[in-house]
C-alpha cells in the first residue's frame, strides 16, 4: 500500500533550480535510502515532504490525502516525523523531559482542574517507549547530554514515536557513531519497519544504507536518477549512480570517502 507519493516535484530558490520534477513513492512499513552527493537536493526534498518548503509544482499525497497545501504542523499530525542530524534535544534535561517537551502530561488539582506536570507519568511512559524500541539507556533520569551519540539517537526516535508517526525521516542517524552504536541504530530502524512504520534514511554511509533498506533512491542534480531494489544492487552500482555512472576513478574515490 502506497503511503507517500510525490509526482513531478519542482523547487527553486530565486534563479536556482534545486529539484527538477522528482517522483518518489514510499510504501507503508518500507525503509527507503535516499542517497546522493552534497548538493543533490536531499535536504530540500525532505523539507518539501515535511512542509518546511512549499513545492513550486507537482503533487504530494500522504495516506491517500493531498497534503501539498498543509503546513509542517498539519503534516506532523497526519503522521510525518523528521529526526534531524543534530537531533534537536534539550541536552541538559532528562529522557522523559525530552520525549514530552512541550506536551507534558499534567495532574488534576482535586481531580478537576489540570495543574502540575505529572513527572511520574512522564517517566513511566518514557520507560515504556524505550522498552518498546528494545533499547537500553543508563537511566531515564540522567541528562541526555551525558549519553553517547547512539543513546541520544534512541531518545530522538522515542520522541518521534510519541507522535504516532506513519513515516519517520532520519537525517544521517549513524554519522560519527562507533560501530557498536551504528548497529544499535540500524536495529532501531528495523524495529520501526516491523511495526509498519515507513522510514526514509538519508545517509552517506552506504554500507548502512545497503544493510537496512528495502530500496535505494539516488538523487543527482535534483533528479531521482535511480530507484534500486536493495536486494538486487551492490555498492559499486550505487556509487556509480551517485557519481554519474561510468566514472570508475570517481566512484572509487567516493567509496573510499564513505
Each PLM stretch: what is its role?
Residues 1-258:
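Glycine-rich phosphate-binding loops of nucleotide-dependent enzymes
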Amino acid at each position: 500500500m502506497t503511503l507517500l507519493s510525490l509526482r513531478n516535484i519542482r523547487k527553486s530558490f530565486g534563479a536556482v533550480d534545486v529539484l527538477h520534477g522528482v517522483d518518489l513513492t514510499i510504501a507503508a512499513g518500507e525503509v527507503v535510502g535516499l542517497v546522493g552527493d552534497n548538493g543533490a537536493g536531499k535536504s530540500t526534498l525532505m523539507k518539501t515532504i515535511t512542509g518546511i518548503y512549499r513545492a513550486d509544482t507537482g503533487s504530494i499525497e500522504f495516506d491517500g490525502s493531498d497534503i501539498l497545501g498543509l503546513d509542517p504542523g498539519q503534516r506532523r499530525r497526519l503522521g510525518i516525523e523528521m529526526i534531524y542530524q543534530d537531533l534537536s534535544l534539550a541536552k541538559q534535561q532528562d529522557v522523559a523531559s525530552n520525549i514530552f517537551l512541550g506536551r507534558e502530561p499534567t495532574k488534576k488539582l482535586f481531580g478537576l482542574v489540570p495543574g502540575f506536570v505529572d513527572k511520574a507519568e512522564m517517566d513511566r511512559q518514557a520507560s515504556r517507549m524505550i522498552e518498546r524500541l528494545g533499547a537500553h539507556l543508563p537511566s531515564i533520569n540522567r541528562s541526555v547530554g551525558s549519553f553517547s551519540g547512539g543513546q541520544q539517537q534512541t531518545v530522538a526516535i522515542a520522541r518521534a514515536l510519541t507522535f504516532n508517526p506513519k513515516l519517520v525521516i532520519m537525517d544521517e542517524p549513524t554519522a560519527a557513531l562507533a560501530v557498536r552504536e551504528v548497529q544499535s541504530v540500524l536495529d532501531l530502524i528495523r524495529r520501526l519497519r516491523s511495526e509498519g512504520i515507513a522510514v526514509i534514511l538519508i545517509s552517506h554511509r552506504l554500507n548502512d544504507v545497503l544493510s537496512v533498506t528495502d530500496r535505494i533512491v539516488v538523487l543527482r542534480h535534483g533528479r531521482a536518477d535511480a530507484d534500486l531494489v536493495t536486494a538486487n544492487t551492490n555498492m559499486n552500482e550505487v556509487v556509480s549512480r551517485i557519481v554519474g555512472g561510468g566514472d570508475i576513478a570517481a566512484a572509487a574515490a567516493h567509496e573510499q570517502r564513505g
